């Protein structure tokens, strides 16, 4: 199974990339993690709908057919660590690859958000996108460690 993290926005601070890379290399070979950064649409005088459409096109191009789409959304379902671990286990048993989508500064196209298989929320707080990448990969690693009985997660 592969976890594909699709993030709108290419540039993150060095500390965030270092942290992301550290967690990404910890995953076992049977659970591959890949990051695809897609270009943020330049604002200029474009309407929000135009921005959404351009970013949606790039996001959809980054996600292979047959992949389960999970969007990160402030209105999504909040999960505990144990609940995310169960979700990860369910995804693995389902056999499909999973794309977790992080929207751009303006969020995600509402129709794309609605069409996703799932909508989850990492926090009730508004977080910078670099922090979301790090938080998401850490929580996915933690969920894996819960399922694997690895000592990383402690109760």
Curated annotation (Swiss-Prot):
Source organism's superkingdom? Bacteria
What InterPro entries does the database record attribute to this sequence? Alpha/beta_knot_MTases (IPR029028), RlmH-like (IPR003742), tRNA_m1G_MTases_N (IPR029026)
Compartmental location: Cytoplasm
Question: GO terms for molecular function, please?
Answer: rRNA (pseudouridine-N3-)-methyltransferase activity
**Keyword annotations for this protein?**
Cytoplasm, Methyltransferase, rRNA processing, S-adenosyl-L-methionine, Transferase
Q: Mind telling me which GO cellular component terms the entry cites?
A: cytoplasm
State one Pfam family annotation.
SPOUT_MTase
The EC number of this protein is 2.1.1.177
Where does it primarily localize? cytoplasm
Q: Which chemical reaction does it catalyze?
A: pseudouridine(1915) in 23S rRNA + S-adenosyl-L-methionine = N(3)-methylpseudouridine(1915) in 23S rRNA + S-adenosyl-L-homocysteine + H(+)
Q: Where does S-adenosyl-L-methionine bind?
A: 72, 103, 122-127
**Alphabetized HAMAP family for the sequence:** 23SrRNA_methyltr_H
Q: What does this protein do?
A: Specifically methylates the pseudouridine at position 1915 (m3Psi1915) in 23S rRNA.
The record's PANTHER family line, in alphabetical order, gives: METHYLTRANSFERASE, RIBOSOMAL RNA LARGE SUBUNIT METHYLTRANSFERASE H
Q: Quaternary structure per UniProt?
A: Homodimer.
Q: Which family does it belong to?
A: Belongs to the RNA methyltransferase RlmH family.
> Which protein are we looking at?
Ribosomal RNA large subunit methyltransferase H
Q: Which organism is it from?
A: Acidovorax sp. (strain JS42)
Give the lineage. Answer: Bacteria, Pseudomonadati, Pseudomonadota, Betaproteobacteria, Burkholderiales
Identify the coding gene: rlmH
């Amino acid at each position: 199974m592969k976890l594909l993290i699709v993030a709108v926005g290419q540039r993150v601070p060095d500390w965030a990339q270092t942290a992301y890379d550290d967690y990404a290399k910890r995953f076992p070979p049977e659970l591959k993690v890949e990051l695809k950064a897609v270009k943020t649409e330049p604002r200029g005088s474009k309407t929000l709908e135009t921005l959404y459409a351009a970013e949606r096109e790039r996001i959809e191009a980054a996600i292979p057919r047959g992949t389960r789409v999970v969007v990160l959304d402030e209105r999504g379902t909040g999960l505990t660590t144990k609940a995310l671990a169960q979700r990860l286990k369910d995804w693995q048993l389902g056999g499909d690859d999973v794309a977790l989508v992080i929207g751009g500064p303006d969020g995600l196209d509402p129709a794309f958000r609605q069409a996703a298989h799932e909508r989850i929320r990492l926090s009730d707080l508004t977080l910078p996108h670099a922090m979301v990448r790090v938080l998401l990969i850490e929580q996915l690693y933690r969920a894996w460690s819960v399922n694997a009985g690895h000592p990383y997660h402690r109760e």
